[in-house]
Every structure is written in C-alpha cells, then in structure tokens.
Regions:
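C-terminal peripheral helix-coil segments that are non-catalytic and often amphipathic
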Residues: 1-7, 133, 137-145, 163, ...
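Helical hydrophobic small-molecule/effector-binding pocket
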Residues: 87-115, 144-150, 169-173
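Helix-turn-helix/winged-helix DNA-binding modules
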Residues: 35-36, 56, 149
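Hydrophobic alpha-helical connector segments
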Residues: 67, 74, 78-106, 120-123
Length: 195
C-alpha cells in the first residue's frame, strides 16, 4: 500500500519559487473571496502550508499584497513589451493590450484594492516604474505609426483604467463601453472619428 502524502510533505518537496507561486495564487483566491482582511492562517491553509511558511516568504500581509501587485505589474510589463514587438502593428497591439488589461481589472477585484493599499511599497514602485517605461515605449511606437494622438501619455492610460474600474461599479459590462470611448479618444485625428 502506498502511503498518502500529507499537504505538509507535498509543501516540503516544492522548490522555493513553487512555494512562492502557490502562496501568491492562494492569497489571490482568498483575498478575492474574503477581502483583504483575510487572516494569514487562512491563506496558509489554502496553500497547503503552515503559517510560518507564509511569514518566511512574506514577513507581513503588506509584503504579501505588494508581491501580488508586483506580479500583476510584471504581467502588464511583459504584455506591453510583447505588444511592442507584435507583427500586428503598434496601434493594434496597444488596443489589444488595453482590452486584455481592462478585462483582467474588471474580473480581479483584489488588484485595485491591493494597489491602493500598497502603492507606496518600494517593490511596487520599482515594478510600476518598469511597467510605465514599457508602456511608454509602446505608446511611442503607436505614435510613430501615426495612429496614437501626439499628446497621449501613460497618465492617460492610468486615467482610462481608473475610469474603467469605476464603470464596473455602475453596470455589468459598462467597463467595455468606457474602454471603447477611451480608445477612441486616444486615436489620432481621423475624419469621422471624433467624439
């Protein structure tokens, strides 16, 4: 008879990066279900880890929240870089990225609240700066293509995401309309394409 593995023994066999990934995934699920006030022992249980394991990886809940935000920002940075290199062209790649990020935001209740909580965290600031630089490169490429208005900046993207986030509170799917309007506003002047 083969002995059953306990969650603790499975945890012990994981690499450090797998442990971190499992904790972040569990934290995202628990925070989405229970809110940011969810206790660390609940997150540990969801990950199949002991509470001490959580605190070894993340000394405080603030550090755990920051790691979640950094993970999402890194995904956005990677998306912006991939979009800039896309064969679809900078404008199409930019709008595709905006749709993907807005949909993630609309379905990820934790991200906005966590970002507001840990926006001043040093790791979040570094990741935000890298993401902003990647978005600036994508905007420059779309601007050079002639499809993005000349005065568009990453601040405009932040405003657009704030508006789409607010629209999720109004009505199901309202964020889509807000994003459509925002993308139209970002486009360079074209006949018949003015708001």
């Amino acid at each position: 008879m083969i002995p059953l593995r306990t969650p603790a023994s499975c945890w012990a066999e994981l690499s450090a990066s797998d442990k971190r990934a499992r904790l972040l995934r569990a934290a995202g699920e628990v925070f989405a279900r229970d809110g940011l006030d969810a206790p660390m022992p609940v997150i540990a249980a969801a990950a199949g880890a002991g509470v001490g394991s959580v605190y070894r990886q993340f000394p405080s809940k603030r550090d755990l929240l920051a790691a979640l935000v950094v993970e999402r920002l890194n995904e956005a940075e990677e998306g912006a870089e991939a979009a800039r290199r896309s064969a679809a062209g900078p404008w199409s790649a930019l709008t595709g990225l905006l749709w993907a990020l807005a949909e993630r935001q609309a379905t990820d209740d934790v991200l906005g609240e966590a970002m507001a909580t840990v926006s001043e965290h040093a790791q979040v600031q570094v990741a935000l700066e890298r993401t902003t630089q990647a978005l600036e490169r994508l905007l420059a490429a779309a601007r050079a293509e002639g499809r993005l208005r000349a005065d568009a900046t990453t601040l405009d993207l932040r405003l657009l995401f704030a508006a789409t986030r607010a629209a999720t509170q109004l009505e199901a799917g309202a964020w889509r309309r807000m994003l459509e309007l925002g993308i139209d506003a970002l486009q360079a002047d074209q006949p018949g394409n003015r708001l």
